[in-house]
């Protein structure tokens, strides 16, 4: 129980410190530097850092849901995910320099989280931390299936995740935050036994790339190319094109928003009309004045 309390305290302390640093960065830095760099670095740190507590499987999914729920409320739209930054670039929502700065910030946050993780384990605040410190150099791989199957699993997870983000990108955080948190939790529960369901290249590189069992190229195929492929497919399905690269819609036909006015349909030949009261019916070719010999 003491180890659990230490882990939970570390989890919430890391989140609180990152939130304080984010607010200070927002107040002190220029708007562009905060939105592109500091915000992403803080979210990457807060996403990776708390897991140094080494939680058991009984708490992992619950804390994962709470973490993503808090992200959606507090972190101003930061993603801490390179594929989300690349999605914004393909959607023409972010420039190339801004995207590169976000990727650099995510890399910096990942390194800071790894440093925090090793420091926490060195303190040996609990038996779990001591065990992790001893096993740090001989960790086991998170990839517990074949490389093609793992790449397919990561691509499917990323596809569902990014398609949900695209559908909810204009929704209020009160709706999008819980929906994304629930999706990530369900995905982690379903695909976790195969690849740990990272679908985040920065998170995967931090947690499992240094572990034995697979080569670096195999890790790249599963945890980088898989999520990238799923993201591109999600954008294509949602938009029908990659807006930053193609103007023409590749999948869906363009509907003309200007419609020609439709004429009033002519009455059928068998239809009869009842004349209004006081009106006379005239036959075509005859005048309205009766001749003297008419009967």
From Swiss-Prot:
One of its GO terms (cellular component) is membrane. Residues 257-295 are annotated as: Disordered. The chain crosses the membrane at residues 1-21, 55-75, 100-126, 146-166, 179-199, 216-236. Residues 77-114, 195-206 dip into the membrane without crossing it. It is found in: Membrane. The keyword Membrane applies. Residues 22-54, 127-145, 200-215 are extracellular. A motif (NPA 2) lies at residues 200-202. It comes from the Eukaryota. Keywords: Membrane, Repeat, Transmembrane, Transmembrane helix, Transport. It catalyses: H2O(in) = H2O(out). Residues 76-99, 167-178, 237-295 are cytoplasmic. InterPro entries: AQP11/12_channel, Aquaporin-like, Aquaporin_11/12, Aquaporin_12, MIP. PANTHER family: AQUAPORIN, AQUAPORIN-12A-RELATED. Belongs to the MIP/aquaporin (TC 1.A.8) family. AQP11/AQP12 subfamily. Homotetramer; each monomer provides an independent water pore. Putative aquaporin. Could form homotetrameric transmembrane channels, with each monomer independently mediating water transport across the plasma membrane along its osmotic gradient. Aquaporins contain two tandem repeats each containing three membrane-spanning domains and a pore-forming loop with the signature motif Asn-Pro-Ala (NPA). This is Putative aquaporin-12A. It comes from Homo sapiens (Human).
